Amino acid sequence: MPKEANMASQDYATQRSSLDAQALINDAPLSRYQWLIAIVCFLIVFVDGIDTAAMGFIAPALAQDWGVDRSQLGPVMSAALGGMIIGALVSGPTADRFGRKIVLSMSMLVFGGFTLACAYSTNLDSLVIFRFLTGIGLGAAMPNATTLFSEYCPARIRSLLVTCMFCGYNLGMAIGGFISSWLIPAFGWHSLFLLGGWAPLILMLLVIFFLPESYRFLIVKGKNTKKVRQILSRIAPQKVQGVTEFHVPEEKVEAGTKKGVFGMLFSAKYVKGTVLLWVTYFMGLVMIYLLTSWLPTLMRETGASLERAAFLGGLFQFGGVLSALFIGWAMDRFNPNRIIAGFYLAAGIFAVIVGQSLSNPTLLALFILCAGIAVNGAQSSMPVLSARFYPTQCRATGVAWMSGIGRFGAVFGAWIGAVLLGNNWSFTMILSMLIIPAAAAAIAIFVKSLVAHTDAT
């Protein structure tokens, strides 16, 4: 072995042949194996995005096909969100106890199977039930894919990589809108559910056969050193030769705690950040789900065609894809809380401008895109921020509970849209009202930068 390589190896291994696995990940160049993990996790959140947004794109055609009033669609819009709350709240502690991979596999089976069932619904009652059950799988998949991938990213570019991975969620929502603009008129609303059902079931096979368990989870739980070595040898094989033991930094401080995952979330070290993350995510999802659920319908009310309404809804989601590279890069270099706060504030401003732009179709599309860039960029960065904030022992729970509690904001956003429409609020009035949750999210995450900025890893 060359002298330089031998000296580098000594930086990782102690006299007991114990290797700091996180230091290995941080210092090694990205391997093909890590890119494979990135692709699989990207596809998971991509199909999650398609299925999450499906109801918003289907709603106008469904209302016309079944002859129901738009105000009757509120329960259908909110049903999946209710399931997502349960899925997120249950899956986090489950993943921290049994592993990320098994939770991901089961979540894809659940939301794929019940999305297919939605395609065969014959009334609103059955559709509400199937969308609720779909939501349980959706709520479990996204935070656990984010957690798993973040644990394979080097600290120097973690925010950039995870934000780019997570933009698959926004891309899935956008592609769902673009596809539905021709798929639904050609083949009916059932076709989008069929697409959104088969895709995760096929992807589940990739998860089972190609996605590894989190090496950090295996180390902290004291499980299968041989398996950890096999995983890390596919990332930096020269660094694991002769190593008999692996560790990660925070286990020296946190391992053996009697608090449990919930005790850690609400310990003095994490409680302020936990509450502020929840408030921020809640307010962000009020904005996103009001627009995701009702923007196509609102556009139809202003005279837009079905195809145009679906296109503009997809354009809003596509904005999150465009912002991923910049916001991830900025979070790795500056205070990530303040970067996100700026994006939320910009989202509220652009929402107000969108409400004033109905008379100019070109400007309307441009400002819808800008609003999507701002709010989806901020929201897609929140799981990254949460994963950075919590240690391995409670990371899946921390990310998932932020997602789960935040989903109450999604339910509220979808519900309040139906209420405001039922009370004859105009397009302009509804869009202008969104400055309130935008400002609240910006303030909450800015305060976090002052009182709870520390990263766990």
From Swiss-Prot:
Membrane topology type: Multi-pass membrane protein
Top-level taxonomic group: Bacteria
A GO CC term assigned to this protein in UniProt: plasma membrane
Ranges facing Periplasmic side: 56-72, 123-128, 190-191, 296-310, 360-363, 422-426
Main subcellular location: membrane
Gene3D superfamilies reported for this sequence: MFS general substrate transporter like domains
InterPro entries linked: MFS, MFS_AAHS, MFS_dom, MFS_trans_sf, Sugar_transporter_CS
Protein location: Cell inner membrane
Coiled coil start-end: none
TM stretches of this protein: 35-55, 73-93, 102-122, 129-149, 169-189, 192-212, 275-295, 311-331, 339-359, 364-384, 401-421, 427-447
Residues on Cytoplasmic side: 1-34, 94-101, 150-168, 213-274, 332-338, 385-400, 448-457
GO terms of molecular function: carboxylic acid transmembrane transporter activity
Keyword line: Cell inner membrane, Cell membrane, Membrane, Transmembrane, Transmembrane helix, Transport
Function, as annotated: Uptake of 4-hydroxybenzoate (4-HB). Can also transport a variety of aromatic acids with hydroxyl substitutions at the 2-, 3- and 4-positions, such as salicylate, 2,4-dihydroxybenzoate, protocatechuate, 3-hydroxybenzoate, vanillate and gentisate.
Family: Belongs to the major facilitator superfamily. Aromatic acid:H(+) symporter (AAHS) (TC 2.A.1.15) family.
Complex formation: Homotrimer.
Name of the protein in question: 4-hydroxybenzoate transporter PcaK
